[in-house]
């Protein structure tokens, strides 16, 4: 059971509209260090919401660039030894420069190298940690029961430990699932929506980390920024699924729906 009251936030709540409007106005420069499977898709998703993505991954440049970005995403999905160096450099630079950053610990707990890397990255105080229930449970120190990048646990199952992890790390924890939960340990927001077909298009979940990083660049309250990003993602998924014949048309429609979301009151 959750130890805090859960507040539901869905599109078109006032806070979400305001945050998306501000994002489109500012077009925040978002530094993305992500896995090779989803790089192109993530860039297109960020462009669709109005952000300015930059995929700077050279270890010689990552620290310098992280300091001038509005937000940073580090996703360890296809991490290599060289990638790990880049990630630690960027995370440290963002931490020193007080740039908000998101850690997406893909498949943490399933494999040793990435699990140790994720724990090292926690030293640089991520603003937000986003993952599925199994990943969050594993990062919190329990057996998440995941199978690679997929979760075998419900997001609600992970919520109590997510709240503890938030208090321990100081990060906002975002758990993706049939219902998304966002918590700072004291406050918890639920976001419903989306569609199961979102799990059938590679990169959809990973790109949410970039969307959160973009919202962090314009909304200084990380709990609110993460909830707004998740709600925008959910409504675009819901609307796209209704007009799609399958995963191929969904991918195109999802980008369109992100782009077409109206912030007019």
Curated annotation (Swiss-Prot):
It catalyses: 5-(2-hydroxyethyl)-4-methylthiazole + ATP = 4-methyl-5-(2-phosphooxyethyl)-thiazole + ADP + H(+). One of its GO terms (biological process) is thiamine biosynthetic process. Keywords: ATP-binding, Kinase, Magnesium, Metal-binding, Nucleotide-binding, Thiamine biosynthesis, Transferase. Disulfide bonds: none annotated. Transmembrane segments: none annotated. The keyword Transferase applies. Its EC number is 2.7.1.50. It comes from the Bacteria. Catalyzes the phosphorylation of the hydroxyl group of 4-methyl-5-beta-hydroxyethylthiazole (THZ). Belongs to the Thz kinase family. This is Hydroxyethylthiazole kinase. It comes from Leptospira interrogans serogroup Icterohaemorrhagiae serovar Lai (strain 56601).
């Amino acid at each position: 059971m959750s130890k805090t009251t859960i507040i539901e936030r869905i599109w078109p709540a006032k806070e979400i509209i305001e945050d998306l409007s501000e994002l489109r106005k500012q077009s925040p420069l978002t530094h993305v260090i992500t896995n090779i499977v989803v790089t192109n898709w993530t860039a297109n998703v960020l462009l669709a919401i109005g952000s300015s993505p930059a995929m700077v991954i050279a270890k010689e440049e990552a620290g310098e660039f992280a300091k001038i970005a509005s937000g940073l995403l580090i996703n360890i999905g296809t991490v290599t030894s060289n990638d790990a160096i880049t990630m630690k450099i960027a995370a440290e630079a963002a931490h020193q420069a007080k740039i908000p950053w998101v850690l997406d610990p893909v498949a943490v707990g399933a494999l040793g190298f990435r699990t140790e890397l994720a724990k090292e990255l926690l030293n640089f105080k991520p603003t937000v940690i986003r993952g599925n229930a199994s990943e969050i449970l594993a990062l919190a120190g329990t057996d998440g029961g995941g199978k690679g990048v997929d979760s075998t646990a419900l997001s609600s199952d992970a919520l109590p430990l997510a709240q503890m992890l938030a208090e321990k790390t100081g990060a906002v924890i975002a758990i993706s699932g049939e219902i998304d939960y966002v918590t700072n340990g004291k406050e918890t927001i639920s976001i419903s929506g989306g569609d199961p077909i979102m799990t059938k298009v590679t990169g959809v979940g990973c790109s949410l980390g970039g969307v959160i990083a973009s919202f962090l660049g314009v909304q200084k309250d990380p709990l609110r920024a993460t909830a707004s990003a998740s709600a925008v993602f959910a409504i675009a998924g819901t609307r796209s699924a209704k007009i799609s014949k399958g995963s191929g048309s969904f991918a195109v429609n999802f980008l369109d729906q992100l782009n077409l979301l109206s912030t007019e009151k």
